[in-house]
Amino acid sequence: MAVLSLNLKKGSLIAVPNLTMVATINAILWAGHVPVIVDTDDDLCLSLDSLKKADKVSALMYVPLNGKSGNSVEIKNYCTEKQIHLIEDSAHALGSKYENLKNCGSIGDLSVISFTPHKIITTGQGGMVLTNNSDYYNFLIQIKSFNRTKDKSDFHEGFGLNFKFTDLQATIGVSQFSKLENFIDQKKRIQKHYNETLSSNKFDLVQFLDHELPWFNTIRLKDNNIDKLVNFLSSKNIETRTLYPPLHTQKYLADYVNVDVTSSLESFEKYLWLPSSTKLTNEEIDYISSTLNSF
């Protein structure tokens, strides 16, 4: 919906970072445009240098992956200078802020937040689109309901689908939002306890800035034994997640990259997401950390 709102000419080029869930790039394809995959920096967010080397794009999907803010201010300024539409895929980033202390999801022409079950707040499935542009807003209101005319009759402006929330989901969402500050506090508690208990010469705990909120606490291995570590932790009943596979490694997306993406590929082989549910207790973190420290 956010990509459709831009009303770009079909086949327009839209940049997307190599490290993101396929939903980000699928939105570009579904809207009839051409993705341009670019590399990421060490913080796992989109690389401005890589973007500058890519084909000229009409829009950019910026992803503050795992709550990391990246070089968002420079990206925003570059998009403004080059007249590139900016969409934020802030699925992971509710509760995080950018270096200018603006909330993730507040600097783009449009922004998207996810409410799937494992996000900081949930409505079961779905999400929301944010914008302060009245044209985009009015389009979104129509397109979410079969592109129905403004008088809500059974006449339609054109093609549209049903993207509406159910009343039940909305009720759950309102309740979840009322608990957001508590969820943020729990995320910070978990982050602090990992910082106090993890210590190993085989990996580093990724540090988050004060204005950033981790979706998952993350370690960076000093070698490429990530599969061995995942299997070891699994044998101890500790579930972990690797990063999303780089987009260019998906067979149906391999043709959408024409810049070097070495950094994102190396990151995929070294970074691991740790258990970070808001219900995780300090005792459970102690067990996870001691197990990791013994690896």
What are these regions (language model features)?
Residues 18, 43, 94, 120, ...:
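Positions that flank functional sites
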Residues 19, 33, 40, 64, ...:
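Histidine-centered beta-alpha loop that forms part of the nucleotide-sugar donor binding/catalytic region
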Residues 45-52, 101-111, 287, 292-294:
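A short alpha/beta connector and helix-capping loop motif
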Residues 59-63, 68, 72-74, 93, ...:
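PLP-dependent aminotransferase class I/II
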Residues 88-123, 152-155:
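Conserved active-site segment immediately N-terminal to the catalytic lysine
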Residues 106-144, 167:
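Active-site PLP attachment segment
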